[in-house]
Swiss-Prot record:
The keyword Membrane applies. One of its GO terms (cellular component) is membrane. This is Putative uncharacterized protein YNL013C. It is a multi-pass membrane protein.
Amino acid sequence: MLTSKIYKLLTERDVLDFKLKIFIRRNVFITHLFFLLHSLLLFLSQFCRREFAFFLPTINLVTHSIKFITLFFFFLNSWASTLSCNPIMARGCHFPILNRPNFVSQILSKFCRMRNNNDTTFKSF
């Protein structure tokens, strides 16, 4: 009964002001998060790959999955062909012809995996 009296005391304008304050506060939190992530990326961009490789094991990360994901993307961005199980052709422009979606051919289009299965490739001249 007390809540109904309080609700009746609130006007429509008060309710809209309250919703607007919640909306603004939520957007402020999101912008703070973006600023934090942006500053973290700027901090990590100061390191070259060799320095980052030595810097990463010394960090005491909260979970092991964060370290695994970071190392996974670090290996994907490196140019060494010995990091993958399949050999990578770095010369020329190859387009794989696939019957199914493939993460490497769609997202990482710089590389073409060469293997012995039903996938075929052709070279564009």
